[in-house]
């Protein structure tokens, strides 16, 4: 069910052998907050969940990963959405991640740049701020 929705939405399944969800007698409202890149697939998952569980309302609020994690930690929402790994200080607060999908990301470098390729570690260092100058990439 859920993994099929994830694949249909263009993400990569993380559990080929996941069992189909079986409806229960859940009632009430579930608030999900966080990552704008997870939001669209979470909307589809919420729709499917609500069809199976008629007495549940799922509200998806899109912002960013940090807001989703903090909101879940602080009890503002029931589930936080994140499109990044948890930071040490987040896991120290007891936050646990459950991966639901993988997504592809492309990094485009201007044609005038002499750099011919970037490793995953270099991209990570650029986005975490460890590398702030192109000259440092080639070292």
Give the ranges of each region predicted by the language model:
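Flexible loop/hinge segments at secondary-structure junctions
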Residues: 1-139
């Amino acid at each position: 069910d859920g993994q099929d929705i994830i694949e249909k939405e263009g993400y990569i399944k993380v559990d080929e052998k996941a069992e189909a969800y079986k409806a229960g007698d859940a009632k009430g409202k579930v608030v999900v907050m966080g990552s704008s890149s997870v939001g669209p697939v979470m909307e589809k998952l919420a729709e499917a969940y609500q069809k199976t569980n008629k007495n549940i309302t799922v509200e998806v609020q899109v912002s960013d990963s940090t807001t989703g994690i903090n909101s879940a930690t602080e009890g503002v929402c029931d589930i936080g959405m994140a499109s990044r790994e948890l930071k040490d200080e987040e896991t120290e607060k007891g936050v646990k991640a459950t991966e639901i999908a993988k997504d592809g990301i492309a990094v485009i470098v201007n044609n005038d740049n002499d750099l011919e390729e970037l490793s995953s570690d270099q991209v990570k260092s650029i986005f975490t701020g460890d590398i702030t100058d192109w000259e440092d990439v080639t070292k």
